[in-house]
From Swiss-Prot:
InterPro entries: FAD/NAD-bd_sf, FAD/NAD-binding_dom, FAD/NAD-linked_Rdtase_dimer_sf, GSHR, GSHR/TRXR-like, Pyr_nuc-diS_OxRdtase, Pyr_nucl-diS_OxRdtase_dimer, Pyr_OxRdtase_I_AS. Catalyzes the reduction of glutathione disulfide (GSSG) to reduced glutathione (GSH). Constitutes the major mechanism to maintain a high GSH:GSSG ratio in the cytosol. Keywords: Cytoplasm, Disulfide bond, FAD, Flavoprotein, NADP, Oxidoreductase, Redox-active center. Its main location: cytoplasm. It is found in: Cytoplasm. Belongs to the class-I pyridine nucleotide-disulfide oxidoreductase family. Signal peptide: none annotated. This is Glutathione reductase, cytosolic. NADP(+) binds at residues 211, 214, 217, 234, 240, 297, 376.
Amino acid sequence: MARKMLVDGEIDKVAADEANATHYDFDLFVIGAGSGGVRAARFSANHGAKVGICELPFHPISSEEIGGVGGTCVIRGCVPKKILVYGATYGGELEDAKNYGWEINEKVDFTWKKLLQKKTDEILRLNNIYKRLLANAAVKLYEGEGRVVGPNEVEVRQIDGTKISYTAKHILIATGSRAQKPNIPGHELAITSDEALSLEEFPKRAIVLGGGYIAVEFASIWRGMGATVDLFFRKELPLRGFDDEMRALVARNLEGRGVNLHPQTSLTQLTKTDQGIKVISSHGEEFVADVVLFATGRSPNTKRLNLEAVGVELDQAGAVKVDEYSRTNIPSIWAVGDATNRINLTPVALMEATCFANTAFGGKPTKAEYSNVACAVFCIPPLAVVGLSEEEAVEQATGDILVFTSGFNPMKNTISGRQEKTLMKLIVDEKSDKVIGASMCGPDAAEIMQGIAIALKCGATKAQFDSTVGIHPSSAEEFVTMRSVTRRIAHKPKPKTNL
């Protein structure tokens, strides 16, 4: 009996060793070479993993068959949009320059096609940089559409239509998200943000449907370049989810720069006419535009991945369900970025990808951490926030909340004559004195807020803000000179219920 037990034990050990020694083509195969996918591939390779990655062929406008290394952010998102924001800002700067002694004696023309070409040149440069980063990390790049065909197997359909399968110990889904259009009659006449970044002709009349950051940013961009812009959104104010006081200021700034706002209004029909695209609003009004942009949300780009067929759980929106380590219910399959629909920001995808690489290959299991994630809306002027809004703080409060605000006319505007105030705000938990939220709407808001985000991440108190010496003269110094409480919000315990 003892002999049999020993033999059985040896057999079990050999079987386990053989299972661990299973040969795979790759330690990791990544589907999607956007920000998260490239980061995960590179960092995993740096940990010693053999890595493959696939991505669709490059094109500025994405579809089910075209994409490009770099993903949405680099090719048709954050980067090209910010380039257009810079371009749009110069119009106002030229106006502001007059009171600073600059005389523009000749007519100044804006050439859309020149800016568009410079934008395309830049995203191609970045596309090539991302490819080099992968090559330098010894990551094998395959051009084609990837799909999962088993817990440890992916299939890549190449440009010529041929299909090749690869096995991998781990598979990472990093396919991002895709812009969606509401099912309004005539919706095929509208464009999404993809096309908006690559229009051949500049739209002199633009209609934007949506109240989120993409809608607000494009309204600012086109208006800054001289277009007539009408912005339609369902709520009373744009930018739902942001601090209400900041939302109101953004709305005033948009109107102050000439954007026509249509709150609590949607579109019911689009029709092609000789004069342009005719639009009918939910209030029965008619408008005509050269371009209609639908900026009404994005959805996880997972439909063609075959995930449900191999047992990977998705939520109702099609997002990949993952745990705190970005692992799906199938132990060998993971997901990061917009495909998981957690916080859909490029830096968050990078953070999740880093945590994944540490967990899967670095011997250091690391949970993705989402507290105090800063973000910005690149309208003109921009809005930036970190931590809790006033409304969120009140909702989550266990004690009294202190609100500090500072609204002022920036020094630059006092000379230029521009009537546009900057607003800065701190939210403080009175009991602990910790700063739990910060927001700013005004020039350079995003640049300033990155430093504030570090302070909040480190648990800074209001007393520490107050003891910090400011940089003078600057707008940023207001964050360390707000001494007087604007308002105190008393904590109201939620009523107990037996239901």
